[in-house]
Amino acid sequence: MMEFLKDFQKMGIYLAYNVNVDAIVYLNEKHIESLIKEFGAENIKKRIDEYPREINEPLDFVARLIHALKTGKPQAVPLVSYEADKWFNSRFKYDFERIGGQVGVIANLLANLDFNKVIAYSPLLGRKQAEMFVNRDNLLYPVVENGKLVLKKPLEAYREDDPVKINRIFEFRAGTKFKLGDETIEVPYSGRFIVACRFEDFARIETSPELKPYLPEIGEMVDGAILSGYQGLRRYYSDGKDANYYLRKAKEDIKLLKKKKDIKIHVEFASIQDRELRKKVIYNIFPLVDSVGMDEAEIAHILSVLGYRELSDRIFTYNRIEDAVLGAKILLDELNLEILQVHTIYYLMYITHNDNPLTEEELTKSLEVGTTLAAARAFLGDIKRPEDVKVGLNIPFNEKGEYVKLRFEEAKAKMRTREYKIVIIPTRLVRNPVSTVGLGDTISAGAFASYLSLLKRKE
């Protein structure tokens, strides 16, 4: 692990597109009981059955929150109503606020790990967001001045009039108990429920026209790029533009980043509720990039779009490793990826083709970087310096580790894997995490960065 930290000091990464502020509430029994009393158990149960896919009113939020607590699975649901947005501000006192969005989380992480250069871009950069980036010389925001590309600290580059996106995050703990009518519910796993702000101002995934011509120059400065935020896209916009317009722009960005130097590009995929939008992102973006990261639920969502409904349903219903491996093989081949990274509560997986220059042992080391960083973040709440990583090394692999390895070996024996390199490792699991927000992003960033460093060693 520590040898990777030395490599990171010589590496540069470009990040785009989504930065926001996370307003975090640590849920307890009183919060939950108060919401149930306010909205009524029967009303909540009825709305849970309707399963709203976006939050138009507070009852939609309460229903989806209770559903997340019952399953213990992390969920994110888009907030689309300005009235509901005001209700959250009047109803909840936030425990604290910090930078969010994949770009925000990953930028601060990599800067604190002493990467040589972290270039973080978001189409909007308000003052509050700029203040939440760590104030370090290696974390920079690209601007154009006098016809030249200039890299500035975010605090020197923000725009006073840019709106700030706020996501509300409700952290819940395993073992929390509450009553919903006659039903007693105990939360099975720690996790978080995200109310993801999806207003139109924040749904434009693009590089500014001024900066766009300089993307090839940025590509030359870095070893790789991590792109995210596509989950914010809308089908249609009030000015007549649509998702296809922004996806065309996003494809241009990828090609420009690779124009002068064929850098590796990773996409961190987040849940897209709208099936048609999900399909558009998958078919437009994935074939142009090298690496994609996701969890097993997102594998199932994508398989459904690709026409593998039965396998998708099996992953949702049974959560078996063998189904996840089969699904990952399909995604790797159908979407022309170099490598697919899967992160779940109990295991991490890489799948790539047999001609990948890295050995299975090296791929395993890369995944271990991801889970070690995530464990350190879960235990400490944040990683503020390279030495914090040692905390993660002292956290044991989860108790299902041996079972995970056994099921993986059984899965490999049953299916054709000769053309692939597939590695799975158990996760290091913190029993009472300070926070679960950003752990998937931390895993993906750590794994992708270490993957790049291992490839560089082969050059």
From Swiss-Prot:
Cofactor binding description? Binds 1 Mg(2+) ion per subunit.
What positions belong to coiled-coil segments?
none
List keywords of the entry alphabetically.
Answer: Cytoplasm, Glycolysis, Kinase, Magnesium, Metal-binding, Transferase
Residue positions annotated to bind Mg(2+) are E268, E298, D441
Q: Catalytic activity, per the record? A: beta-D-fructose 6-phosphate + ADP = beta-D-fructose 1,6-bisphosphate + AMP + H(+)
Q: Name one GO molecular function term.
A: magnesium ion binding
Q: Where in the cell is it found?
A: Cytoplasm
Enumerate the Gene Ontology biological process terms: fructose metabolic process; glycolytic process
Q: In which pathway does it act?
A: Carbohydrate degradation; glycolysis
Q: Which cofactor does it need?
A: Mg(2+)
Domain named ADPK: residues: 1-457
Broadest EC class assigned to this enzyme: transferase
EC number(s) of the enzyme?
A: 2.7.1.146
Question: What is stated as this protein's family in its record?
Answer: Belongs to the carbohydrate kinase PfkC family.
NCBIfam families found in the cross-reference section: P_fruct_ADP
Task: Spell out the protein name for this chain.
Answer: ADP-specific phosphofructokinase
The upper taxonomy is: Archaea, Methanobacteriati, Methanobacteriota, Thermococci, Thermococcales
- Give the encoding gene's name: pfkC
